[in-house]
Amino acid sequence: MTAEQLLEKTYAAFNARDVDRALSAMHPEVAWPNGMEGGCVHGHRGIREYWTRQWGLIDPRVEPRGFEWEPDGRVAVDVHQVVRDLAGRVVKDEMVRHVYRLEAGLIRSMEIRSGPSRGAGAPGPTRTGP
């Protein structure tokens, strides 16, 4: 499985609220940003607890729009993120950049950066490799 396929699988699992499927793509000691409260959560248990808490408050959906390899080997993903409140009202609609470090074919860490490098107007998915 390519890095892009692994990440697409993970985004699809997150959007389906299938925590077990998403965690199957992650290293047991994964480091994950807590985008709601700040800081970072660690490991499968930390992510499960964080996402469960998050989904009880908001309804986020993330769609990868393009992949790019960074010089240090990490994979950057331009993501369209739409966050709704539990009544369905859009509270956030933006492009963000997620940057992943992979280890042994699994996600080892992720960081969130504001805005994609190519801008939100980039046409369709873009994939570039190392």
Residue ranges and their predicted role:
Residues 31-41, 53-57, 113:
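A short gly/proline-enriched turn/hairpin at secondary-structure junctions
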Residues 1-2, 48-130:
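A beta-strand edge to alpha-helix "cap/lid" segment located at domain peripheries
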Residues 16-31:
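Short, well-ordered alpha-helical segments enriched in acidic and aromatic residues
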